[in-house]
């Protein structure tokens, strides 16, 4: 019984010695790998293997080198994370640019957009400003024509008493002709001034639009008809 207990104790001592030797060997190996890394050798182990567990197998100088490596990697880790974040932000910005309409146009037309893209954008902005100016000018033309027509209507209302007999006899034909001629002259004057303002000497070289010439001809025909009737019938028309 005592012999079996003694043999058990011996086996435990042997196992403990073997385990301590294995642990010491592993610790020495890790410290050696750490030193090799400090000396510029390539190693797959991280710097965490240079822990303080191996301080007994290293002198103070080598241990200080290991601590410097650990501190340097700890200082570089925030910088590395910041660089990774910047890289991710740059990739996201590139993806957003790739989906933008400008990027699609540049991808579709290639170097043409690079060469003439700025000109096209400036031309589009200038066209929008010109369209806005034309709309304002057209609105002012409408307003002025309405003023002329209202003034002609008021003027015609004042002369209704004097022309009542002529209207009764001739059915208002002469009054409509005279008013149409007067209003046509006023509208033609307004439109002619607007066209001259917009196109300048171009209208003098090319001429007036056909619709404006036709309108003036019609007004002239009405005037000629009125004068011919006046000449033919004399005081009977009065």
Curated annotation (Swiss-Prot):
Q: Provide the tissue specificity.
A: Expressed by the venom gland. Moderately expressed in the venom gland transcriptome.
Q: Where in the cell is it found?
A: Secreted
**What is the annotated signal peptide range for this record?**
1-25
Which cysteines in this chain are paired by disulphide bridges? 27-50, 31-54, 34-66
Say yes or no: keyword Ribonucleoprotein present: no
Please list the GO terms describing molecular function. Answer: opioid peptide activity; opioid receptor binding; toxin activity
Q: Which GO terms describe its biological process?
A: chemical synaptic transmission; neuropeptide signaling pathway; sensory perception
**Mind telling me which residues form the propeptide?**
124-167, 177-195, 206-230
One matching Pfam family: Opiods_neuropep
Alphabetic keyword roster: Cleavage on pair of basic residues, Disulfide bond, Endorphin, G-protein coupled receptor impairing toxin, Neuropeptide, Opioid peptide, Secreted, Signal, Toxin
A single Gene Ontology CC annotation of this entry is:
neuronal cell body
Give the residue ranges for region: Disordered.
76-103
Q: What is its main location?
A: secreted
**InterPro entries named in the record:** Opioid_neupept
Something else known: In contrast to venom of most venomous species, the venom of Meiacanthus fangblennies is relatively painless, when tested on mammals. While species-specific nociceptive effects are possible, this defensive venom is surprisingly multifunctional, being markedly hypotensive (via neuropeptide Y and/ or enkephalins), weakly neurotoxic (unknown components, possibly PLA2s), and perhaps also pro-inflammatory (PLA2s and/or enkephalins).
Q: What is the role of the protein in this entry?
A: Met-enkephalins compete with and mimic the effects of opiate drugs. They play a role in a number of physiologic functions, including pain perception and responses to stress. Enkephalin peptides found in Meiacanthus fangblennies induce physiological effects via their interaction with delta-type opioid receptors (OPRD1) (tested on M.grammistes). Therefore, finding a proenkephalin sequence in M.atrodorsalis venom suggests that this protein act in the same manner.
Report the family membership.
Belongs to the opioid neuropeptide precursor family.
Q: What protein name does the entry list?
A: Proenkephalin-A
Originating species: Meiacanthus atrodorsalis
